[in-house]
Swiss-Prot record:
Segments passing through the bilayer: 20-40, 53-73, 76-96, 112-132, 141-161, 171-191, 209-229
Gene name linked to the record: adrI
Family from the record: Belongs to the paxB family.
Domain of life: Eukaryota
Organism: Penicillium roqueforti
Keyword set includes Transmembrane: yes
Topological type in the membrane: Multi-pass membrane protein
Protein's recorded name: Terpene cyclase adrI
Glycosylation sites: 164
Gene null: resulting phenotype: Drastically reduces the production of andrastin A.
């Protein structure tokens, strides 16, 4: 009975829910784009990469496949994936420009950054293409995007913890990504409830795991940021006191 009432309420407000989903789709697209420009700003300000090699290269590989090889699978984004691909091409140039500042301890990597980023990007693109051939472009777009999202959420945590510094980190970049992510989750939930799901959602154990993992990771990042920032401030005050003696 309750299920029937819920379904009836959803059908009664189908048009309103569709408008909300469309707004969230546009909001997510804008926030993802601004997120990439925030990466550029942070990299330029701190002179080190603001994102890891795997998240960035996987994003570019996924975008290339679904912008140019299987564009119909990303048609609902109305060209947004192509825009992200072009923006990411600019981002990777900036990232590589400053990446050498992180590899003084490993000259072999430092001398071959363009080659390294190129090989990893091509590798991810081949992987995304192979997966699309295996499961079909529509499902490939969905689960390939899941990998992009997971790396985008996990990468910054690994980066800030390994550096033990907030240099190259940004709460603005995190906030834009979080808004895009949570807005996207709500949008996909509306699609699912109204029977317009572009891929599996609540009926999929893998999707439930993905939703839970992403939420945990995105709530973890600002905690890590503030803990390390407090540590930096404490160290700065300690150094200031020692110098004043």
């Amino acid at each position: 009975m309750e299920e029937s009432s819920l379904l009836s309420a959803i059908l009664d407000h189908r048009d309103a829910l569709a408008s909300v989903a469309e707004f969230l789709r546009i909001l997510a697209g804008i926030c993802w784009t601004l997120n990439y420009f925030s990466m550029l700003r942070t990299s330029r300000k701190d002179k080190i990469p603001s994102t890891g090699i795997f998240p960035l290269c996987n994003d570019i590989g996924w975008e290339f496949i679904y912008a140019f090889i299987y564009p119909t699978a990303s048609a609902h984004w109305e060209g947004g994936v192509r825009v992200w691909f072009l923006v990411h091409c600019i981002v990777i140039i900036f990232i590589i420009k400053y990446a050498h500042n992180e590899w003084d301890h490993f000259p072999l990597i430092q001398r071959n950054l363009y080659f390294l980023y190129g090989v990893v990007t091509i590798g991810f693109a081949i992987g995304q293409y192979s997966f699309a051939r295996e499961v079909g472009p529509d499902l490939g777009f969905f689960y390939g995007g899941v990998l992009c999202q997971t790396l985008a959420s996990l990468g910054p945590i690994a980066q800030i913890l390994s550096r033990n510094s907030t240099r190259g980190a940004s709460l603005l970049t995190w906030l834009l990504r979080a808004i895009a992510t949570f807005g996207g989750f709500i949008k996909l939930t509306i699609y699912y409830l109204t029977g317009n799901a572009a891929g599996p959602w609540f009926e999929s154990p893998m999707c439930k795991f993905y939703i839970g993992l992403t939420l945990v990771l995105d709530f973890t990042y600002p905690i890590c940021y503030y803990v390390i920032q407090r540590q930096e401030l404490a160290n700065a005050q300690k150094e200031k006191k020692e110098k004043s003696k």
